[in-house]
Curated annotation (Swiss-Prot):
It holds the Pfam family Zip. The chain crosses the membrane at residues 7-27, 35-55, 102-122, 142-162, 172-192, 206-226, 240-260, 282-302. GO terms for molecular function: androgen binding; G protein-coupled receptor activity; zinc efflux transmembrane transporter activity; zinc ion transmembrane transporter activity. It comes from the Eukaryota. Its main location: Golgi. It is found in: Golgi apparatus, trans-Golgi network membrane; Cell membrane; Cytoplasm, Perinuclear region; Mitochondrion. Transports zinc ions across cell and organelle membranes into the cytoplasm and regulates intracellular zinc homeostasis. Participates in the zinc ions efflux out of the secretory compartments. Regulates intracellular zinc level, resulting in the enhancement of AKT1 and MAPK3/MAPK1 (Erk1/2) phosphorylation in response to the BCR activation. Also functions as a membrane androgen receptor that mediates, through a G protein, the non-classical androgen signaling pathway, characterized by the activation of MAPK3/MAPK1 (Erk1/2) and transcription factors CREB1 or ATF1. GO terms for biological process: bicellular tight junction assembly; intracellular zinc ion homeostasis; regulation of cellular response to testosterone stimulus; regulation of vascular endothelial cell proliferation; zinc ion transmembrane transport. Belongs to the ZIP transporter (TC 2.A.5) family. It comes from Xenopus laevis (African clawed frog). It catalyses: Zn(2+)(in) = Zn(2+)(out). This is Zinc transporter ZIP9-A. InterPro entries: ZIP (IPR003689), ZIP9 (IPR045891).
Length: 303
């Protein structure tokens, strides 16, 4: 199967899988308490996937590419001049490692700061409304969806970049990693929007935009890459960088928007009696379970 066919099939599978997993909370009628529990579970999934799946996968993608390149270079060097170039190789290897450490931190921070700026810009536009609290809540919903869409788009770029390497194993690993967190993210997004009181039709639109983001961007990335840019892309470890950037956006959405909203602390600072009690024991268990599920799945995926 050629690269274009495989990327098309992977994109279609991503779209369907993401949309179906997001529809589940809409298809089942939950009571108020069960909806809160599902939302808490979704928040746990968002946090767990950011920390246990996306960041490790991004770091792994970075180091895998550099280690493969080093292994290839060493093979070439042994064939040509083993003794003369040994010192140069070790220096280049150390330089690569220092670059990688910088990539990890910079990518994560840029993703987080990007979402922080998007959040602030969205909030400043909303503050002119008559009811600032309602405006803040609306901004929270938009920012949550936008953050996950940006995250999904970065995932799409990662998959497109992986497809351009013409290595089927790399494509499948990136696809599995993306689906591992896209399905829970779609579930988490929809349950959060339901908890926030959005109409079902609008939730479906939000979900569709989120589901489309990664497949569309993966196709565009793959089609937009020429041979020369493919080579340049492999040099700067684009797959790993894109995944780490998306992890930064994901962490912001999970920790700054979804968790406070679920915990009753939200952006609202009104002295609300219901909000002050926080999470019940069952909800805390659901939150911890949500955090642990991606961890267990990622351990299974690594083996």
């Amino acid at each position: 199967m050629d690269d274009f066919s495989s990327i098309s099939l992977l994109s279609l599978a991503m779209l369907v899988g993401c949309y179906v997993s997001g529809i589940i909370p809409l298809a089942v009628n939950f009571s108020e308490e069960k909806l809160k529990l599902v939302t808490v579970l979704g928040a746990g999934l968002l946090c767990g996937t950011a920390l246990a799946v996306i960041i490790p996968e991004g770091v792994h993608a970075l180091y895998e590419e550099i280690l493969e390149a080093k292994h290839h270079d060493l093979g070439e060097i042994h064939k040509v001049k083993e003794a003369e170039t040994g010192a140069e190789t070790s220096v280049a290897h150390e330089h690569d490692h220092s670059n990688l450490h910088a990539y990890i931190g910079v990518s994560l921070v840029l993703g987080f700061v990007f979402m922080l700026l998007v959040d602030q810009i969205g909030s400043s536009h909303m503050h002119s409304a008559d009811d600032p609290e309602a405006a803040r809540a609306a901004s929270s919903k938009i920012t949550t969806t936008l953050g996950l869409v940006v995250h999904a788009a970065a995932d799409g770029v990662a998959l497109g970049a992986a497809a351009s390497t013409s290595q089927t194993s790399v494509q499948l690993i990136v696809f599995v990693a993306i689906m591992l967190h896209k399905a829970p993210a779609a579930f988490g997004l929809v349950s959060f929007l339901m908890h926030a009181g959005l109409e079902r039709n609008r939730i479906r639109k939000h979900l569709l935009v989120f589901a489309l983001a990664a497949p569309v961007l993966s196709m565009l990335t793959y089609l937009g890459l020429s041979k020369s840019s493919k080579e340049a892309l492999s040099e700067i470890n684009a797959t790993g960088v894109a995944m780490l950037f998306s992890a930064g956006t994901f962490l912001y959405v999970a920790t700054v928007h979804v968790l406070p909203e679920v915990g009753g602390m939200g952006h609202s600072h009104k002295p609300d009696v219901g909000a002050a009690k926080g999470l019940s024991r069952l909800e805390v268990c659901a939150l911890v379970l949500g955090c642990l599920i991606p961890l267990v799945l990622s351990i299974g995926h690594q083996h």
